[in-house]
From Swiss-Prot:
The keyword Cytoplasm applies. Transmembrane segments: none annotated. One of its GO terms (molecular function) is translation release factor activity, codon specific. Peptide chain release factor 2 directs the termination of translation in response to the peptide chain termination codons UGA and UAA. One of its GO terms (cellular component) is cytoplasm. The gene is prfB. This is Peptide chain release factor 2. Belongs to the prokaryotic/mitochondrial release factor family. Keywords: Cytoplasm, Methylation, Protein biosynthesis. The keyword Transport does not apply. Gene3D superfamilies: 3.30.160.20, 3.30.70.1660, Release factor (1.20.58.410). The lineage of its organism: Bacteria, Bacillati, Actinomycetota, Actinomycetes, Micrococcales. SMART domains: PCRF. InterPro entries: PCRF (IPR005139), Pep_chain_release_fac_I (IPR000352), Pep_chain_release_fac_I_sf (IPR045853), PrfB (IPR004374).
Length: 374
């Protein structure tokens, strides 16, 4: 069936106008002016961390505005291309228009998903922790596979990351790993990845070649900001120091530079060992602890709302995705039903479709809960 280009182009323009109304270009321009002024301050780089946040937010906000303008221009160009194909009755030009229509739909979908990230902390940078679960050495290996998957995803998108802590398992893989994704909206984007991930495969660590099911947990928290005012009394924490370790339990540092902070009232434990000094690891651990406490407060509030709605199960993140390598190959999200038959691509960071489906699914769930309490 021939593509109805006028209808498609009209629909694209309508969607873009809806996105524009939500995004508010005037507000973006005002934010760009504000950040540009901050970026021009002569003392900006006196605090490198704060300076990096300012420049990152400026670049991101400029990119948001540019994407709106670029999409509008691409739709105009597509309309011109379709007219040219009709005038010249050129099949090649028509095929080019079909291809461009597909690309614009994809770009529009990505931009539309961004408008769904309207949660209180969605615009924050993210701290991601991966922990091996049941499954022994296979689970530890799976945790390392997931770490590589997320770092590759960030690398492909040009997002800066920093690995804060890695705790290696004895035989292979990781007990746990924590890293930051230093870009605005990283939390809103990656929070749909939180939950239990399951791997099914023939174990490379089993001499009998048996199929093994293993698990890993992914936690995603918003990075704390100075304006959050999360005060932690010294009496509420216990700080332990130890030597950083590498694969197989080998010590990689001759000094006690690694830090473990335990928040006594909640039992939350944060370890950091990838910075060079104990002071740096302590500062990083405190920042992550504050972020986890911030998220815990939000989750407590969300639990109250769910109880009012008659939904006492806060389990959307549990058992969220299966990665099956044998006897067949399939990666499937158990919430959204989105699935692909190429696990290799997924483990190489090709997870945008899963994330987009998760964000849309989450918004649908929120709408249902809001309707139940209306």
């Amino acid at each position: 069936m021939a593509t109805d280009f006028p209808a498609e182009i009209s629909a694209l323009r309508g969607t873009l106008e809806q996105i524009t109304a939500v995004t508010d270009p005037d507000a973006l321009r005002a934010r760009i002016a504000e950040l540009s002024e901050a970026a021009a301050a002569p003392d900006l780089w006196d605090d490198p961390d704060a300076a990096q946040k300012v420049t990152s937010r400026l670049s991101h906000t400029q990119s948001e505005l540019e994407r709106l303008d670029t999409l509008r221009s691409r739709i105009d160009d597509l309309e011109t291309l379709v007219q040219l194909a009709a005038e010249e009755d050129d099949a090649d030009t028509l095929a080019e228009a079909e291809a461009e229509l597909t690309k614009i739909r994809t770009s529009m979908g990505e931009l539309e998903v961004r408008t769904l990230l309207a949660g209180e902390y969605d615009s924050r940078e993210a701290v991601v922790t991966i922990r091996s679960g049941a499954g022994g050495v296979d689970a530890a290996d799976f945790a390392e596979m997931l770490l590589r998957m997320y770092l590759r995803w960030a690398e492909r998108k040009g997002y800066p990351t920093q690995v804060l802590d890695t705790s290696y398992a004895e035989e292979a893989g990781l007990k746990s790993a924590t890293f930051e994704v230093k870009v605005p909206y990283a939390f809103g984007t990656l929070s749909v990845e939180a939950g239990t991930h399951r791997l099914v495969r023939i174990s490379p660590f089993d001499n009998q070649g048996r199929r093994q099911t293993s698990f890993a947990a992914v936690e995603v928290i918003p990075l704390i900001e100075q304006t959050d005012h999360i005060d932690i009394p010294e009496t509420d924490i216990r700080i332990d120091v130890f030597r950083s370790s590498g694969p197989g339990g080998q010590s990689v540092n001759t000094t006690d530079s690694a830090v473990r902070i335990t928040h006594l009232p909640t039992g939350i434990v944060v370890s950091m060992q990838n910075e060079k000094s104990q002071i740096q690891n302590r500062a990083a651990a405190m920042r992550v602890l504050q972020s986890r406490l911030l998220l815990a407060m939000q989750e407590e509030e969300n639990a109250k709302k769910k109880e009012l709605a008659g939904d006492v199960k806060a389990s959307w993140g549990d058992q969220m995705r299966s990665y099956v390598l044998q006897p067949y190959q399939m990666v499937k999200d158990l919430r959204t039903e989105h699935e692909v038959g190429n696990p290799s691509a997924v483990f190489d960071g090709d997870i945008d479709d899963f994330i987009e489906a998760g964000i849309r699914w989450r918004r649908q769930q929120q709408t249902v809960r809001e309707s139940a309490t209306a």
